[in-house]
UniProtKB/Swiss-Prot annotation:
Localization: Mitochondrion inner membrane
InterPro entries: Surf1/Shy1, Surf1/Surf4
Keywords recorded for this protein, A-Z: Membrane, Mitochondrion, Mitochondrion inner membrane, Transmembrane, Transmembrane helix
Membrane topology listed for this record: Multi-pass membrane protein
Record bears the keyword Manganese: no
Pfam families (UniProt xref): SURF1
GO cellular component terms attached to this protein's record: mitochondrial inner membrane; mitochondrion
Protein name: SURF1-like protein
Amino acid sequence: MATSSSVAAASKRGGGLYWALLSVPVVTFGLGTWQIFRKQQKEELIATLEAKLSKEPAALPTNPADLAHMEYERVAVTGTFLHDQEMLVGPRTVTREVFSGMADLPEAGVQVITPFRLADTGEVILVNRGFVPEAQAPPHKRAAGQVEGTVRLEGIVRHGESQTAFVPDNHPEQNTWYWIDVFTMASNRSALPVLIDATAECTPPGGFPLGGQTNITVRNEHLSYIITWYSISAITLAMWVFLRRKGGNRSGLRAPPPRRT
């Protein structure tokens, strides 16, 4: 027969376990609530991006510092391309959302970054003209797309890219580029650290480079996370209540019956 001290110790251990198990529904409920706030933030971000992309193109600010808060906004510029200074960044894949009808378009290729001299100030900026298949990367194989003279184009302000662990280092001295480092590219071409992505409408008659390669992907899967965390919270809470009720009937967790005299 269990002594009163052993029963008390068992009850204490059982009580501690119950409260430890209760932390699971509490924590998962908190995670579900946090995902609600994340979902609201993501929806606000998406709305902001859509508003920027839907606005009419603005003039490019004369002060590059003014572009700090203009990423993904549309701008219009007039000037001339400096094709002899272009830089090829790759390997890259084409953004098929823009050219969904071109089923035979190769997947692998590069993006063409070309210095662009502004007509009004004489300053040079960088323009990502878009995608070119690997076979047509050499300029002489896409001569029709090397537009000459003064042109007006619309683009989307970008801040460049960050190098990830799996992307090699750029080699400016060899004109070899794996990722878009705006400041290094601009310095290498005596340009302002300003980059715009040419829109799809800026694709030249020759077909390449294919503009409209700005890839804006904002994942918003927070609703599924909310459902998941709240479901786990509800299930584990129900399990906790069930175990809590059953625990009192288990051996060692219930006080022995009173002795008969």
